[in-house]
């Protein structure tokens, strides 16, 4: 797209929102089946929406990922499905694999059509027998001459339809690989789509794909460089997980905006429920979850923009974002609206499966949490525990006993290295000091002082956790991989501590008192969960005061969020 970068970006983002707003206002967003209308997708293509992450050289906008993620939060307040499709298309679909791993020839061939929306894209990884366990993939591509012939079945593929372009993960000579595949406009014996009833993602196309000797040109194979096809897949998934967190922030803003009118209208025992502590607590806590998700989104997107792989950080954002959205939907939004939540046309009842589904797609939360933990301990295990195992193997010792002098002598080198680390850690931990951003030092505001306390708490907690992590590795040794419950639990606590640190640092740089108060409340609650304590009266006063401020319109950006009409209204006396 031509024009100055700033002008093009502003225009495309503004016009994309306008397209969605117009169709929402006219009631023309969905067709008779409840799917997004083709006209909507074309209109979005006309204004450059599908090229947000495509380089300008190929007709796209070339947004940074931070710009893209922040925009998704705004868009999700209008329509979360369209925001989700932007991620499917640009992150886990064909765009990111091509931009990152494609040759110049491949980019020139595919990206212009993806940028203008002539071809929309999807990501085909999951199979009937392979979800979290990607070693179970069965779809294969066999080369004959200048063509790969693909045979296999994919499942739960969002945004797939005839005539679209997919990133296909398959096995080539037993190794995972990624092919860019232009699906034909019509189904055939070689390619067909498999429909099924699906509660979630009801406004998008989500189907299975069955291939039988389906031809794909050899030149459509992406080169991962170091690694294999899963390297390509994870690169896109990292971005998709950040986008999920950004989407969750927008969806929760929509929930909060639609809690307020009902809380003002509904009266119990002569007073509007907006005056009740429980409702105020729900609104205050929801605001905290929103700020935490926005903090995680900015943090992880910034890391990706700086060139970091960010896999562990993106996992934290995905898990927290999806779990926060689930908690917000069930514990805060539904309970405030009561029975009306289940009426046709209610935001909760119509979308409850979409509110819950992010806990599963792009990696189920606890499975991802274990992957996070394994990545976290990998270097420590390699440095200290692997040498112990190698020494035992060399000496043929199967059941080590440190009371046996020969065993102790065989392990003297590796054990000494570990002992130095352990003693040094125990000695230095109480004396560690942490340097925090200048904003903390310069401000005397109570909000900043409390946020500094949260940041210091989480930093110290994470430092201390190194001993618990190492102790867990020492206790279970080679059986650690089978101790899934312990790994998931410890991983979850580490993730919460990171969320506290990121949220407190993010809010301290924010100049809005309500944002800082929301961050303070959610950090306080997450610290309580980490410590296993009970909520204090001070916390209840803090979160309900925040809820009162939100009910009076003081949460930034909420006035721009659509509010649905009340269902089954009545005359208040």
Description of each model-found segment:
Residues 147, 151-191:
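A short core secondary-structure module
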Residues 48, 312-417, 513-573:
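Alpha-helix capping/hinge segments and adjacent helical runs
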Residues 265-281, 508-513:
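Terminal amphipathic helices with adjacent charged low-complexity linkers/tails
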Residues 1-89, 102-120, 132, 144, ...:
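Amphipathic, small/basic residue-rich leader segments at the start of a protein or domain
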Residues 260-261, 278-305, 497-506:
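Loop-to-helix element that buttresses phosphate recognition and phosphoryl-transfer chemistry
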Residues 187-213:
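Flexible, small-/acidic-enriched active-site or ligand-binding loops
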Residues 409-573:
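C-terminal amphipathic alpha-helical interaction region
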Residues 185-187, 209-240, 256-275, 298, ...:
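A glycine-rich, basic-preceded beta-loop-alpha segment at the flavin cofactor/substrate interface
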């Amino acid at each position: 797209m031509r024009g100055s970068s700033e002008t093009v970006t502003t225009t495309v983002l503004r016009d994309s929102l306008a397209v969605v707003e117009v169709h929402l206002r006219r009631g023309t967003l969905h067709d008779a089946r409840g799917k997004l209308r083709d006209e909507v997708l074309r209109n979005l293509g006309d204004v450059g929406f599908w090229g947000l992450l495509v380089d300008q050289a190929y007709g796209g906008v070339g947004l940074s990922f931070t710009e893209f993620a922040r925009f998704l939060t705004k868009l999700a307040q209008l329509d979360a499905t369209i925001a989700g499709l932007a991620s499917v298309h640009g992150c886990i679909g064909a765009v990111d694999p091509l931009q990152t791993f494609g040759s110049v020839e491949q980019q020139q061939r595919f990206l212009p059509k993806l940028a203008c929306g002539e071809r929309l894209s999807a990501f085909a990884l999951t199979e009937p027998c392979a979800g979290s366990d990607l070693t179970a993939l069965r779809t294969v591509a066999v080369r004959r001459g200048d063509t790969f012939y693909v045979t296999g079945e994919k499942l739960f593929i969002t945004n797939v339809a005839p005539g679209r372009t997919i990133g296909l993960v398959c096995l080539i000579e037993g190794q995972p690989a990624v092919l860019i595949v232009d699906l034909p406009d019509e189904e055939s014996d070689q390619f067909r789509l498999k429909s099924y009833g699906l509660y979630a993602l009801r406004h998008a196309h989500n189907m299975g794909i069955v291939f039988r000797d389906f031809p794909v040109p050899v030149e459509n194979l992406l080169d991962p460089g170091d690694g294999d096809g899963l390297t390509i897949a994870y690169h896109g998934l990292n971005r998709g997980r950040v986008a999920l967190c950004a989407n969750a922030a927008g969806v929760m803003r929509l929930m909060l905006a639609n809690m307020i009118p009902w809380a003002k209208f509904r009266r119990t025992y002569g007073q509007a429920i907006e005056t009740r502590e429980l409702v105020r607590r729900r609104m205050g806590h929801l605001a905290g979850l929103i700020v935490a998700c926005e903090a995680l989104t900015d943090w992880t997107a910034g890391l990706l923009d700086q060139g970091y792989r960010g896999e562990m950080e993106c996992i934290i954002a995905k898990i927290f974002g999806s779990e926060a959205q689930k908690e917000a939907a069930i514990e805060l939004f539904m309970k405030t609206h009561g029975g009306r939540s289940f009426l046709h046309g209610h935001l909760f009842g119509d979308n409850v499966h979409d509110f819950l589904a992010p806990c599963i797609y792009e990696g189920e939360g606890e499975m991802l949490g274990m992957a996070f933990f394994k990545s976290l301990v990998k270097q420590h295990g390699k440095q200290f525990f692997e040498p112990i195992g190698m020494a035992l193997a060399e000496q043929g010792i199967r059941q080590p006993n440190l009371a046996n002098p020969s065993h102790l002598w065989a392990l003297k080198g590796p054990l000494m290295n570990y002992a130095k680390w352990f003693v040094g850690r125990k000695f230095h931990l109480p004396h560690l000091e942490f340097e925090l951003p200048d904003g903390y030092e310069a401000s005397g505001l109570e909000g900043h002082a409390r946020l500094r306390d949260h940041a210091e708490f989480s930093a110290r907690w994470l430092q201390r956790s190194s001993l618990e992590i190492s102790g867990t590795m020492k206790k279970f040794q080679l059986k650690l991989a089978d101790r899934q419950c312990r790994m998931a639990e410890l991983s979850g606590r580490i993730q919460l501590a990171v969320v506290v640190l990121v949220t407190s640092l993010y809010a301290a740089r924010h100049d809005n008192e309500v944002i800082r108060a929301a961050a303070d409340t959610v950090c306080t609650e997450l610290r309580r969960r980490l410590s296993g304590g009970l909520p204090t009266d001070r916390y209840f006063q803090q979160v309900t005061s925040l809820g009162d401020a939100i009910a009076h319109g003081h949460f930034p950006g909420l006035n721009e969020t659509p509010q649905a009409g009340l269902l089954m209204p009545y005359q208040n006396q």
